[in-house]
């Protein structure tokens, strides 16, 4: 009798098993940021800073992602998410996770950060802790600095509940007595002046050499009765409302800048999505506020401390409680060269920020602005800052008679006003300013300089993974390439033509660009590794990006894993791919690095049977980057630069066992910390010492 051997069928996974929800993955990233506030590797004031970063991130999460999901729910839209969760299910899970995270945030602040700061001589004094002299000083500060800027608003039929600005600090005050007109007033709202600092330092002569601070909220609370003469304030409670801050622009607008200005004014008063109150706020008060803002109880967050932690900043005089100062390195070839053009003619120059200085990029623009042989400068600007040195140099170049073209992305989220101001500065200087393509954000990072040399026109280019923002370049990790490779420079020239003109899609020699060729080529590169793996050859993919959400690429990576391709993903923030699932993704490992610097480099590595492909790009692996943005992907062809990026920018991070987190198959993240028998490896710290 012959025995029949049946082979087990591979597991079949549904949507929820295959994909991690995008919104919940964003929250998970912010939880990793929050854990930095208790990481013993971080100095005390840096721990506090991570608490504030967590607050800012969460504010934006509610303003954009929660607000969008709430709109889907209210409008009963049948949206299709890769994981199959409905808006209602997503909002429920967000609420549970966010409430727990915020409670932990304030627990860390009150039980760890504040006590440790007090041990170092830095205190945030409550009303009952002030000496008489300090109380007198605070009262005078209130009378001279705060009271003149306050606008108390009584709540009665003639004074309806005011429209309060998004994320502003406010107080609701319960009152007894009658006002000057004999009216019985029970409630009033007092908005805190946004122009005043949220933390006020007491004079040294009143603190015995210690660094004592008082919260603005505490000052207003103590003296709020002064704003209601003849009445008694029986209660004063902080609150803060977060509103929908997403902008909606139609594609048929005649003037993008003017349309944006109109939208920006409405952002301050969008639909409420979250209410924060202090824990001492009585039930009848927060229920009243919930009703006024049309919010449900699950959208209420009761916190044990100031409701506006994102603004809890002060210039603390304790440098030893911060990271050691770091001076970015300038490549040797640039130190030796009299001008940057001669250095770039000798070789391509790779810059790895913030370990290497951003100043060579500024130097390129400055020398171009002043060089009589330079004819034209073209640059994309996504986030640069209104007071940017780069913007001033471009304006100077235009005034010097150079042909300056700036492609400014007005719709860079939360930088819209700044970018409108930048556009005005450059237009007044005589530069040509365009706003890119309606319906597609221009996210590519490119500079092109055209210079006359020996009766010929020679092009110089810079391509990068990060914004032309000198401040961000000190805290974000990014790559930039200074090059005179004429194929690359020609490609950059053609993309600028595409952005400023109205022609058809241009054909490029070296660069990949979204929304045209990038996605399809990435699919082809993964397919090539699949073919090699099936042929029994080594196959490997390493991807380092900020986010991975695009379903076609995720499915292609699953296919590659099933074929035996070894895949390492270094994803700082959102990851919708689920690793380690038997029969689907057991050859995929996902890690996230969260540390001193914000990881921002985008690097794609494909083994390609030993003839490695290495790309640096402005694009994350997200639908918006690949299909709704103008992005550039740069091949690194120089063998030495390839090796350097692999060793420093990929392998180094795969070895990290100090700042890394590993994504588990159940969607949770596990801290990857070295054991006693392992040598500690901090990728960012290694780069601080290794960059030459």
Curated annotation (Swiss-Prot):
Catalysed transformations (reactions): [phosphate](n) + ATP = [phosphate](n+1) + ADP
Listed GO MF terms: ATP binding; metal ion binding; polyphosphate kinase activity
Protein's UniProt keywords contain Transport: no
InterPro entries attached to this UniProt entry: PP_kinase, PP_kinase_C_1, PP_kinase_middle, PP_kinase_middle_dom_sf, PPK_C_dom2, PPK_N_dom, PPK_N_dom_sf
SUPFAM superfamilies linked: Phospholipase D/nuclease, PHP14-like, PPK N-terminal domain-like
Residue positions binding ATP: 57, 476, 572, 600
Any single GO BP term: polyphosphate biosynthetic process
Function: Catalyzes the reversible transfer of the terminal phosphate of ATP to form a long-chain polyphosphate (polyP).
Protein name in the entry: Polyphosphate kinase
Organism: Acinetobacter baumannii
């Amino acid at each position: 009798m012959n025995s029949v051997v049946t082979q087990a069928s591979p597991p079949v996974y549904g949507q929820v098993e295959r994909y991690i929800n995008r919104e919940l993955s964003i929250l998970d990233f912010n939880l990793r940021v929050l854990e930095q506030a208790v990481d013993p590797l971080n100095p005390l004031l840096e721990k506090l800073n991570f608490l504030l970063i967590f607050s800012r991130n969460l504010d934006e999460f509610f303003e954009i992602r929660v607000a969008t999901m709430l709109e889907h729910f209210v409008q009963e839209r049948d949206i299709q998410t890769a994981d199959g969760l409905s808006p209602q299910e997503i909002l429920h899970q967000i609420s549970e996770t966010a409430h727990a995270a915020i409670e932990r945030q304030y627990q860390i602040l009150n039980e760890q950060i504040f006590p440790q700061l007090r041990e170092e001589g830095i205190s945030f004094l409550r009303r009952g802790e002030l000496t008489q002299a300090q109380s007198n000083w605070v009262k005078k500060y209130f009378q001279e600095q705060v009271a003149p800027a306050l606008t108390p608003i009584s709540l009665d039929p003639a004074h309806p509940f005011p429209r309060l600005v998004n994320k502003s600090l406010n107080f609701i005050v319960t009152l007894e007595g009658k006002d000057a007109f004999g009216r019985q007033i029970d409630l009033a709202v007092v908005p805190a002046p946004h122009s005043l600092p949220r933390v006020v330092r007491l004079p040294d002569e009143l603190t015995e050499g210690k660094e004592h601070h008082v919260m603005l909220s505490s000052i207003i609370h103590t003296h709020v009765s002064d704003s209601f003469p003849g009445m008694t304030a029986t209660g004063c409670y902080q609150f803060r409302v977060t509103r929908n801050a997403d902008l909606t622009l139609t594609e048929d607008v005649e003037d993008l800048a003017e349309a944006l200005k109109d939208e920006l004014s409405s952002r301050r008063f969008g639909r409420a999505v979250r209410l924060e109150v202090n824990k001492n706020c009585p039930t009848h008060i927060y229920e009243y506020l919930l009703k006024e803002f049309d919010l449900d109880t699950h959208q209420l967050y009761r916190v044990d401390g100031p409701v506006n932690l994102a603004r809890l900043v002060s210039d603390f005089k304790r440098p030893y409680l911060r990271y050691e100062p770091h001076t970015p390195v300038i490549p040797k070839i640039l130190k030796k060269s009299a001008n940057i053009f001669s250095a770039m003619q000798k070789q391509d120059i790779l810059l790895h920020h913030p370990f290497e200085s951003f100043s060579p990029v500024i130097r390129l623009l400055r020398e171009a602005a002043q060089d009589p042989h330079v004819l034209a400068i073209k640059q994309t600007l996504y986030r640069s800052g209104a007071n940017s040195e780069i913007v001033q140099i471009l304006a100077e170049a235009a005034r010097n008679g150079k042909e300056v073209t700036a492609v400014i992305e007005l719709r860079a989220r939360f930088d819209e006003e700044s970018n409108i101001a930048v556009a005005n500065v450059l237009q007044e200087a005589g530069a040509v300013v365009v706003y890119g393509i309606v319906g597609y954000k221009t996210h590519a990072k490119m500079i092109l300089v055209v210079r006359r040399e020996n009766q010929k026109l020679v092009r110089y280019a810079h391509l990068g993974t990060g914004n032309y923002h000198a401040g961000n370049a000190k805290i974000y990790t990014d790559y930039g390439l200074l090059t005179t490779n004429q194929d690359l420079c020609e490609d950059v020239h053609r993309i600028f033509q595409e952005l400023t003109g109205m022609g058809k899609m241009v054909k490029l020699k070296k660069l990949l660009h979204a929304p045209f060729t990038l996605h399809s080529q990435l699919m082809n590169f993964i397919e090539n590794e699949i073919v090699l793996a099936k042929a029994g050859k080594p196959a490997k993919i390493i991807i380092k990006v900020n986010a991975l959400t695009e379903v076609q690429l995720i499915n292609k990576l699953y296919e590659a894993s099933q074929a035996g391709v070894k895949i390492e993903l270094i994803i700082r923030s959102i990851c919708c791919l689920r690793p380690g699932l038997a029969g689907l993704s057991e050859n995929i490992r996902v890690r996230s690095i969260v540390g001193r610097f914000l990881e921002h480099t985008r690097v794609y590595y494909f083994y390609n049977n030993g003839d490695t492909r290495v790309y640096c790009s402005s694009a994350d692996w997200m639908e918006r980057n690949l299909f709704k943005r103008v992005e550039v992907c740069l091949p690194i062809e120089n063998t030495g630069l390839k090796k350097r990026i692999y060793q420093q920018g990929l392998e180094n991070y795969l070895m990290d066992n100090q700042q890394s987190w590993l994504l588990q198959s159940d969607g949770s993240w596990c801290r990857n910390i070295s054991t006693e028998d392992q040598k500690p490896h901090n990728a960012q710290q290694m780069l601080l010492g290794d960059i030459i």
